[in-house]
């Protein structure tokens, strides 16, 4: 018997393959199929029926293991409440597929690609499987190039690689969300690109806050959704481990379409990459695998690699990924963050001390790193300027204890000059954001890399020693700082 499984997320005419549930253990279920009709690994299975209370059940599962005796073990993507042994299981004959393309912008999806924002169905022309191989070597773009963000502190001291992976470290309330939204805004304006945000295993409240803030800052255009700059995919803390393990792949699949078909530069945000590993660990235990170091899954490196290797630049476009990294108990040697670090090209560390001083973005200029900051990649001028800025800030950090105990007057003339320049640099690293205009009232600034380098060179050379340090706070390029100083002198 043939049946059109369009309603089950598969758009081909396939022979109906029906099994039944033999065992349910939490989010894991075993199903038996007729001899010779075994589903493939990663095939999507659908359980439909009624629970004892008469309510409709529709649970999607993914095949993880072939057990023998015509049985498979699958992991559920939603709650298994109400499922009973003997219920029918339909093999869709293909992996889970999700809607892709322009119709996804401005919308929120779950792991199955179903909209969860109450704005009606998605009118997508195409669906793509979430399990795709990484691009072949011949498709990759191996040229090292910087991905300009328009944010001074990032572009100068820890530049992002086009098609690279960046780790974003920072506690609560130091400005992660605002930095993410500014990057989404800037890639749309400067690169004509789009962004995909994957909320993996984080708080539902945070996901809702981010959505609300994106609407307020016009990153999501409520009046005309197609003009939005981002698609959101959420699999939050309350979801079963199967959903949290696969939601990163759903977000990545949407991003790959923009890169490969629309030939765009895409920003992919994953918040939080640790929760992806954590979900994989839960699934691994449920499937009966022997745990590895610190209780993690034995397949940790393979799972991380299969996700990270798909995030890359091709000759058509690029996916640059920014991943929030939670470090359990601040232990950097924990297998989850340690495996993540192997894939990162740059780290952006947000500092609570800078946020307390009111310096935003609160990116720590000494702790943030990038493999791109090499003279043969960024050029001698950029490299020398960045090193000069770091040395000045490092010296200021060393002198802070002396200043706190004895005061500025006890320093040598040279050290006092270093401190004055370091304070100007610290303030010049701050910048007004476009997405914060609604809250601050000051217009946002996009600063090109050339302007950034020029500004810091002028501070380091001593050309601007006569200007007050307040003139450098929350401005764009150096011309704005000199103009601000001129206005304040006229007022005095």
UniProtKB/Swiss-Prot annotation:
State whether keyword Lipid biosynthesis applies.
no
- Chief place where the protein resides: plastid
Against Gene3D superfamilies, the record matches this protein to:
2.40.10.170, Bovine Mitochondrial F1-atpase, Atp Synthase Beta Chain, Chain D, domain 3, P-loop containing nucleotide triphosphate hydrolases
GO BP: any one term: proton motive force-driven mitochondrial ATP synthesis
Q: What is its EC number?
A: 7.1.2.2
**According to the lineage, what is the superkingdom?**
Eukaryota
Give the enzyme class: translocase
Q: GO terms for molecular function, please?
A: ATP binding; ATP hydrolysis activity; proton-transporting ATP synthase activity, rotational mechanism
Q: Which InterPro entries match?
A: AAA+_ATPase, ATP-synt_VA_C, ATP_synth_F1_bsu, ATPase_a/bsu_AS, ATPase_alpha/beta_chains, ATPase_F1/V1/A1_a/bsu_N, ATPase_F1/V1/A1_a/bsu_N_sf, ATPase_F1/V1/A1_a/bsu_nucl-bd
Protein topology in the membrane: Peripheral membrane protein
UniProt-annotated location(s): Plastid, Chloroplast thylakoid membrane
Keywords of this entry: ATP synthesis, ATP-binding, CF(1), Chloroplast, Hydrogen ion transport, Ion transport, Membrane, Nucleotide-binding, Plastid, Thylakoid, Translocase, Transport
Catalytic activity reads: ATP + H2O + 4 H(+)(in) = ADP + phosphate + 5 H(+)(out)
Specify which residues bind ATP according to the UniProt entry for this protein. 170-177
- GO-annotated cellular components: chloroplast thylakoid membrane; mitochondrion; proton-transporting ATP synthase complex
Function as written in the Swiss-Prot or TrEMBL entry: Produces ATP from ADP in the presence of a proton gradient across the membrane. The catalytic sites are hosted primarily by the beta subunits.
* HAMAP family (alphabetical): ATP_synth_beta_bact
The similarity comment for this entry is: Belongs to the ATPase alpha/beta chains family.
Which PANTHER family does the record associate with it? Answer: ATP SYNTHASE (PTHR15184), ATP SYNTHASE SUBUNIT BETA, MITOCHONDRIAL (PTHR15184:SF71)
Name of the protein in question: ATP synthase subunit beta, chloroplastic
Q: Which gene encodes it?
A: atpB
């Amino acid at each position: 018997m043939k049946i059109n499984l369009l309603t089950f997320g598969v758009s081909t005419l396939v022979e109906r393959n029906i099994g039944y549930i033999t065992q349910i253990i939490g989010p894991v279920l075993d199903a038996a199929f007729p001899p010779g009709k075994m589903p493939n690994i990663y095939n999507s299975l659908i359980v439909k029926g009624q629970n004892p209370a008469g309510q409709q059940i529709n649970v999607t599962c993914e095949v993880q293991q072939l057990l023998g005796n015509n049985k498979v073990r699958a992991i559920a993507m939603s709650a298994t409440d109400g499922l009973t042994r003997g219920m029918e299981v339909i093999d869709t004959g293909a992996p889970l597929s999700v809607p892709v393309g322009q119709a996804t912008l401005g919308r929120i999806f779950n792991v199955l690609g179903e909209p969860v924002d109450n704005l009606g169905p998605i009118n997508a022309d195409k669906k793509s499987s979430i399990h795709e191989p990484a691009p072949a070597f011949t498709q990759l773009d191996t040229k090292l190039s910087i991905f300009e963000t328009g944010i001074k502190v990032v572009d100068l001291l820890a530049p992002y690689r086009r098609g690279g992976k960046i780790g974003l470290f920072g506690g609560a309330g130091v400005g992660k969300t605002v930095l993410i939204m500014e990057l989404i805004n800037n890639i749309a304006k400067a690169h004509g690109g789009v962004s995909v945000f994957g909320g993996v295993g984080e708080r539902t409240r945070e996901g809702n806050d981010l959505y609300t803030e994106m609407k307020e800052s016009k990153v999501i255009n409520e009046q005309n959704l197609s003009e939005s700059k981002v698609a959101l995919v959420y699999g939050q803390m309350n979801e079963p481990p199967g959903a949290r393990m696969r939601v990163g792949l759903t977000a990545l699949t949407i991003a790959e379409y923009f890169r490969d078909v629309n030939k765009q530069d895409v920003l992919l945000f994953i918040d939080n990459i640790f929760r992806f590993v954590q979900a994989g660990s839960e699934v691994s235990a449920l499937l009966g695998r022997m745990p590895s170091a610190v209780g993690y899954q034995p397949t940790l490196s393979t799972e991380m690699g299969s996700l990270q290797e798909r995030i890359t630049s091709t000759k058509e476009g690029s996916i640059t990924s920014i991943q929030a990294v939670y470090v359990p108990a601040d232990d950097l040697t924990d297998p989850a963050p340690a495996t993540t670090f192997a894939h990162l090209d740059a780290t952006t560390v947000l500092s609570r001390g800078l946020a307390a001083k009111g310096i935003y973005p609160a990116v720590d200029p000494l702790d943030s790193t990038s493999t791109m900051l090499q003279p043969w990649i960024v050029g001698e001028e950029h490299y020398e300027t960045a090193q000069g800025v770091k040395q000045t800030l490092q010296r200021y950090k060393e002198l802070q204890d002396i200043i706190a105990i004895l005061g500025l007057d006890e320093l040598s003339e040279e050290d006092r000059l270093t401190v004055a320049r370091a304070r100007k640099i610290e303030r010049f690293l701050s910048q007004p954001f476009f997405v914060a205009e609604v809250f601050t009232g000051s217009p946002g600034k996009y600063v090109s890399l050339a302007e950034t380098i020029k500004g810091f060179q002028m501070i380091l050379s001593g050309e601007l020693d006569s200007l007050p340090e307040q003139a450098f706070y929350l401005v764009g390029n150096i011309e704005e700082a000199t103009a601000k100083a001129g206005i304040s002198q006229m007022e005095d």
